[in-house]
Amino acid sequence: MVNIPKTRKTYCPGKNCRKHTVHRVTQYKKGPDSKLAQGKRRYDRKQSGFGGQTKPVFHKKAKVTKKVVLRLECVSCKYKNQLVLKRCKHFELGGEKKTKGAAIQF
């Protein structure tokens, strides 16, 4: 279980800052695919008409987890930066901190 706080003081490479400032942390999420991308247009053109599936459908999935990407937004200048973490199965943003000697609860 990886638990990351919602704010983090780190270096801001923005033009106005260039110093350590507080950043707001969120998890990166992939946006919707563009329907105008060249590959998508080519694929749709090839799929149209008779003939069924024209390109191979990928089945040999190798990875169990994805790498966690953090999106850091500077509080003072709104500069957005991304930070990649290692692979983990359970990721939590702003969860409760563990205390020493406390019983583990699931």
Swiss-Prot record:
Residues modified to N6-methyllysine: K55
UniProt keyword annotation of Cytoplasm present: yes
Keyword line: Cytoplasm, Methylation, Ribonucleoprotein, Ribosomal protein
Classification via PROSITE patterns: RIBOSOMAL_L44E (PS01172)
Annotated region (Disordered), positions in chain: 25-55
Function: Component of the ribosome, a large ribonucleoprotein complex responsible for the synthesis of proteins in the cell. The small ribosomal subunit (SSU) binds messenger RNAs (mRNAs) and translates the encoded message by selecting cognate aminoacyl-transfer RNA (tRNA) molecules. The large subunit (LSU) contains the ribosomal catalytic site termed the peptidyl transferase center (PTC), which catalyzes the formation of peptide bonds, thereby polymerizing the amino acids delivered by tRNAs into a polypeptide chain.
Name used for this protein in its record: Large ribosomal subunit protein eL42
Native species: Schizosaccharomyces pombe (strain 972 / ATCC 24843)
